């Protein structure tokens, strides 16, 4: 899970170990030059099938020599004597509670220890159990003597397509790499990465998608985090937003106030009956991007409507727009992952929404930008009833078309997209490569949205 370093926090955390650098990588956080050099020079990454930072890609394709699952060892990698591998059963609420505690105490946290992700059982079920999921891809490490869970890494199946070369590749998304704070000197991170790679390779999958800060060879592109305040007053109370010069709290609240009801005629929640139609709309729309995710209808239903088809999801929200003839012309989705707020007398939780996938049939029409702004404005409005205080997105997809008019602001965090064991040509990330500022009204190359 990659997240922006919220607020205007310092990016100069001390460099101590490879595990801490990987932790910062998971935060999508900019590192100091010394940290970047340490990561770049670390021997582990030189052994991995990733492009070097200095090479120019002349041809797309796998980096490693062709292998088969029979070439992959059957046994897990050895761990130091005090620890043992543990495959987590996320259908077991007790083990989910263990994972929650590990992540809550040790996962992504801003440097000032102000915010932590507040995961729910439902979120874990949604994020870790899409169609095609495998139990042995939920990899834990426990202390032998006590059974305590002290590390975790996960993989979930993802099929992606490179539109320019028309190549379709089975892969996984790597997520939730987490190591207990007291074990950062045990060099568990490289072992976890190698072990999840081994398990994925045994299923004849040789590529992986992942995201992180600008410290690894070699990103497809860099995107920048964007934030749209929904409840500015609360964001100010917890230190997420600051009062600009020559502004009052009242003026800031008024600036970000949204209507109570959506504006688009024909907007309604997406249902299971819409899956096939919306997926077709998305595929046509996403032809404009360089890299996209392909879904079966079963996968798309899971990601858009949630893990339990018999109840409304508390994690992901999807809406469609129907015209007067009942034809679906647009759709949007976002997922909810709140923060726990630490050491604040007024608030203990911050509602966070993350823009997910969207599509419109107006992408070739003159009114496309206007339509996209209307669509995302309604996404912001609908999020209010779910307790959202800030709505986040990246500069991927066509997001730069609506950021200014919808009053998003650039955050401090940057997120790189990476492909493991595959070379591709560089892609546009919606920002200027030198200044890192948003390039308005420019289609990015990234049509994949990872958790």
UniProtKB/Swiss-Prot annotation:
One of its GO terms (cellular component) is cytosol. It is an enzyme of class 2 (transferase). Its EC number is 2.3.1.97. Its main location: cytoplasm. One of its GO terms (molecular function) is glycylpeptide N-tetradecanoyltransferase activity. One of its GO terms (biological process) is protein localization to membrane. It catalyses: N-terminal glycyl-[protein] + tetradecanoyl-CoA = N-tetradecanoylglycyl-[protein] + CoA + H(+). Competitively inhibited by SC-58272, a peptidomimetic derived from the N-terminal sequence of a natural substrate. Gene3D superfamilies: 3.40.630.30. Adds a myristoyl group to the N-terminal glycine residue of certain cellular proteins. Substrate specificity requires an N-terminal glycine in the nascent polypeptide substrates. Ser is present at position 5 in almost all known N-myristoyl proteins and Lys is commonly encountered at postion 6. Basic residues are preferred at positions 7 and 8. Belongs to the NMT family. Has an ordered Bi-Bi kinetic mechanism, with myristoyl-CoA binding taking place prior to peptide binding and CoA release occurring before acylated peptide release. Cooperative interactions between the acyl-CoA and peptide binding sites of NMT contribute to its extraordinary chain-length specificity. This is Glycylpeptide N-tetradecanoyltransferase. It comes from Candida albicans (strain SC5314 / ATCC MYA-2876) (Yeast). The gene is NMT1.
């Amino acid at each position: 899970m990659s997240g922006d370093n919220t607020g205007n926090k310092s990016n100069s955390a001390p460099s101590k170990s490879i595990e801490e650098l990987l932790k910062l990588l998971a935060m999508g956080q900019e590192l100091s030059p010394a940290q970047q050099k340490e990561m770049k020079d670390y021997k582990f990454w030189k052994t991995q099938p990733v492009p070097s930072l200095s090479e120019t890609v002349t041809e797309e394709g796998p980096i490693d020599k062709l292998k088969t699952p029979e070439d992959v060892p059957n046994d897990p990698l050895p761990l130091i004597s005090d620890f043992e591998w543990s495959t987590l059963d996320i259908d077991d609420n007790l083990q989910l509670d263990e994972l929650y505690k590990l992540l809550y105490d040790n996962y992504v946290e801003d440097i000032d220890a102000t915010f932590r992700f507040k995961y729910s059982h439902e979120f874990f079920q949604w994020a870790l159990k899409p169609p095609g999921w495998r139990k042995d891809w939920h990899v834990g490490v426990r202390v032998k003597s006590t059974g305590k869970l002290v590390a975790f890494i996960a993989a979930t199946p993802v099929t992606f397509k490179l539109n320019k070369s028309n190549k379709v590749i089975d892969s996984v998304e790597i997520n939730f790499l987490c190591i207990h704070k007291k074990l950062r000197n045990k060099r568990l991170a490289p072992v976890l990465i190698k072990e999840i790679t081994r398990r994925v390779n045994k299923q004849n999958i040789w590529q992986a998608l992942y995201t992180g800060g600008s410290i690894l060879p070699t990103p497809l592109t860099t995107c920048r985090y964007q934030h749209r305040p929904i409840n500015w007053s609360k964001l100010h109370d917890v230190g997420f937003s600051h009062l600009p010069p020559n502004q009052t709290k009242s003026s800031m609240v008024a600036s970000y106030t949204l209507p109570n009801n959506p504006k688009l005629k024909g907007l309604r929640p997406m249902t299971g009956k819409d899956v096939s139609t919306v997926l077709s709309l998305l595929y046509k729309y996403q032809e404009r991007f360089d890299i996209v995710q392909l879904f079966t209808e079963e996968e798309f239903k899971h990601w858009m409507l949630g893990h339990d088809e018999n109840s409304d999801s508390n994690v992901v929200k999807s809406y469609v727009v129907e015209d007067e003839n009942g034809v679906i012309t647009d759709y949007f989705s976002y997922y909810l992952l709140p923060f726990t707020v630490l050491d604040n007398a007024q608030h203990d939780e911050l509602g966070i929404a993350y823009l997910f996938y969207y599509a419109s049939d107006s992408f070739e029409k003159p009114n496309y930008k206007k339509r996209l702004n209307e669509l995302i404005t309604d996404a912001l409005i609908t999020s209010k009833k779910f307790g959202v205080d800030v709505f986040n997105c990246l500069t991927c997809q066509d997001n730069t078309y609506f950021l200014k008019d919808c009053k998003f602001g650039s955050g401090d965090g940057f997120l790189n997209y990476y492909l493991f064991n595959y070379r591709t040509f560089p892609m546009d990330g919606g920002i200027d490569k030198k200044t890192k500022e948003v390039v308005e009204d420019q289609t990015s190359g990234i049509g994949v949205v990872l958790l």
